[in-house]
């Protein structure tokens, strides 16, 4: 959150990714507890167009965070890439009209 506050203004960074590590120096390991701090898109995106057409915009994984929740009609966060594939397949089996964005 501190990095997001600092990286604003004229030269703002669109997305800050904070990923905690565990372990000792020389043996750090990444955790899956990543957090994204994104700015909303400055202009309409394809997602806006889809949503304005009364279609679904389903975000699987970090998509909701990447777009700062803008225009996402439904979202599910995943634990890893394979979970993302599985969740995408689950959504494909449901009655959806629109975009499944993984």
Report the location of each language-model feature.
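Feature captures the catalytic ectodomains and active-site-proximal regions of enzymes
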Residues: 1-102
């Amino acid at each position: 959150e501190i990095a997001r506050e600092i990286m604003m203004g004229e030269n703002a960074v669109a997305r800050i990714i904070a990923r905690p590590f565990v372990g000792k120096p020389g043996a750090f390991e990444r955790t899956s507890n990543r957090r994204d701090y994104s700015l909303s898109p400055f202009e309409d995106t394809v997602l806006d167009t889809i949503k304005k057409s009364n279609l679904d915009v389903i975000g699987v994984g970090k998509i909701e965070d990447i777009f700062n929740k803008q225009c996402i009609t439904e979202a599910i966060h995943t634990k890893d890439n394979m979970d993302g594939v599985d969740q995408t397949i689950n959504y494909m089996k449901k009655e959806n009209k629109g975009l499944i964005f993984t």
